[in-house]
Curated annotation (Swiss-Prot):
Origin species: Methylococcus capsulatus (strain ATCC 33009 / NCIMB 11132 / Bath)
Family annotation (InterPro entries): Ribosomal_Su5_D2-typ_SF, Ribosomal_uS9, Ribosomal_uS9_bac/plastid, Ribosomal_uS9_CS, Ribsml_uS5_D2-typ_fold_subgr
GO-annotated cellular components: cytosolic small ribosomal subunit
GO biological process, one term: translation
GO MF: RNA binding; structural constituent of ribosome
Stored PROSITE patterns: RIBOSOMAL_S9 (PS00360)
Protein's name according to its UniProt entry: Small ribosomal subunit protein uS9
UniProt key word Ribonucleoprotein: yes
Length: 130
């Protein structure tokens, strides 16, 4: 008999993560690599683990993730968001805990576009009085 699998989609900046969870031993696979293999920075690994640690499920679930787009920081945030959604699908009672920690809300901050006549999004050319 097949195990029950729970799914959640997470987004952050331009990264999109599809997160699948099932009961297991706490193994995390991201694009067919281990968590340590995929994320070199400790901060990114911590961000991914935050949602599981908030509900104390670190060694009770196996997590399989497919993530595309963005950079390491955005991908870590997308995985955390997707994981929070998958955990809510698993047990609705986890929602208040995850909501209080801020993992359910999609971080809507995106890169501001560069404007014509400016160096960057807001950086103006140097002003010369004479």
């Amino acid at each position: 008999m097949a195990q029950t699998q729970y799914y959640g989609t997470g987004r952050r900046k331009s990264a999109i993560a599809r997160v699948y969870t099932r009961t297991g031993t706490g193994q995390i696979r991201i694009n067919d690599k281990s968590l340590e293999e995929y994320f070199g920075r400790k901060t990114d690994r911590m961000i991914v683990m935050q949602a599981l640690e908030a509900v104390e499920m670190t060694d009770k679930l196996d997590v399989n993730v497919k993530v595309i787009g963005g950079g390491p920081s955005g991908q870590a945030g997308a995985i955390r968001h997707g994981l929070a959604r998958a955990l809510i699908e698993l047990d609705e009672a986890m929602r208040p805990v995850l909501r209080k920690a801020g993992y359910v809300t999609r971080d809507a901050r995106e890169v501001e576009r560069k404007k014509v006549g400016l160096h960057k999004a807001r950086r103006r050319p140097q002003y010369s009085k004479r």
